[in-house]
UniProtKB/Swiss-Prot annotation:
Signal peptide range in chain numbering: none
Family matches, as InterPro entries: RSV_NS2
Subunit structure: Monomer (instable). Homomultimer. Heteromultimer with NS1. Interacts with host RIGI (via N-terminus); this interaction prevents host signaling pathway involved in interferon production. Interacts with host MAP1B/microtubule-associated protein 1B.
Species for this entry: Human respiratory syncytial virus A (strain A2)
Highest taxon in the source lineage: Viruses
Name under which the protein is recorded: Non-structural protein 2
Paired cysteines (S-S): none
Length: 124
């Protein structure tokens, strides 16, 4: 009879909750990855150099966000995410303040799934 069997082997941790992350959780996470200090700096630079009004600045913000989203996830997932964003209004919208004709993006308005985010709270 074999007596070399030892019950002291470490057990592997079993993960029982294997549900996929919800799309809203993924989008929230992606938004936090995309919108960084560098992203806001680029938007503010565009606002100053091109003297954008609020509508133009918001459009510039969203175009840059979508380009970064597309680059990050690829075209197939991008289509799914933008359909979801459009349907549920989860696109991050910028908050601008006006400095005597020059706009500055100071943060992101809250959406259904994300809190208000100020540029000071963002990852560098």
């Amino acid at each position: 009879m074999d007596t070399t069997h030892n019950d002291n082997t470490p057990q592997r941790l079993m993960i029982t909750d294997m549900r996929p992350l919800s799309l809203e959780t993924i989008i929230t996470s992606l938004t936090r990855d995309i919108i960084t200090h560098k992203f806001i700096y680029l938007i503010n630079h565009e606002c100053i150099v091109r003297k954008l009004d609020e509508r133009q600045a918001t459009f510039t913000f969203l175009v840059n966000y979508e380009m970064k989203l597309l680059h990050k996830v690829g075209s197939t997932k991008y289509k799914k995410y933008t359909e979801y964003n459009t349907k549920y209004g989860t696109f991050p919208m910028p908050i601008f303040i006006n400095h005597d004709g020059f706009l500055e993006c100071i943060g992101i308005k809250p959406t259904k799934h994300t809190p208000i985010i100020y540029k000071y709270d963002l990852n560098p």
